[in-house]
Design a protein with these regions (language model features):
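Low-complexity, S/T/G/P-rich flexible repeat/linker segments used as non-globular hinges
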Residues: 3, 105-123
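Short, structured secondary-structure boundary patches
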Residues: 32, 96-111
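Short amphipathic secondary-structure patches
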Residues: 54-103, 118
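Alpha-helical assembly-interface signal, strongest on the long, hydrophobic N-terminal helix that forms
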Residues: 1-69
Length: 123
């Protein structure tokens, strides 16, 4: 290479460094997409567990069971991953259930996704 004004003008390796930074940025974006996807999946699982638990509790409540929330807790615990019933209350003929599902976000730690559902007779 020729020197311009006494300074070497060597550009070899410049694209390698730029390529390495581009790959690192792409990897970081991909990792964030995976974590966001895990959080969204946990939220959907929590909603499914809340819906099913509320339906089970409402069916027991309409049938005259003494503790319809026990059915909600039992059903939530059988989900994959197991959901925890945070609250279960009777509101007239309806049952309101809130659950949470754990989600592992790697370096961001363990978090939980929550959801609520209401179920009861129609009409």
């Amino acid at each position: 290479m020729r020197a311009v004004g006494g300074v070497a003008s060597d550009d070899q390796g410049n694209a390698t460094v730029l390529g390495a930074f581009a790959i690192a940025a792409l990897a970081a974006v991909l990792i964030m997409v995976i974590y966001v996807g895990a959080a969204v999946l946990a939220r959907h699982r929590a909603q499914a567990a809340a819906d099913l638990s509320a339906l089970a509790a409402a069916a027991d409540h309409v049938a005259g069971e003494s503790d319809p929330c026990a059915a909600a807790r039992t059903l939530a615990a059988t989900q994959r991953p197991p959901a925890e019933v945070v609250s279960c209350r009777i509101d007239g003929e309806d049952v309101l259930v809130s659950v949470r599902v754990p989600v592992d976000l790697g370096r961001f730690g363990m978090r939980s996704a929550g959801a609520s559902a209401r179920a009861g007779p129609v009409g």
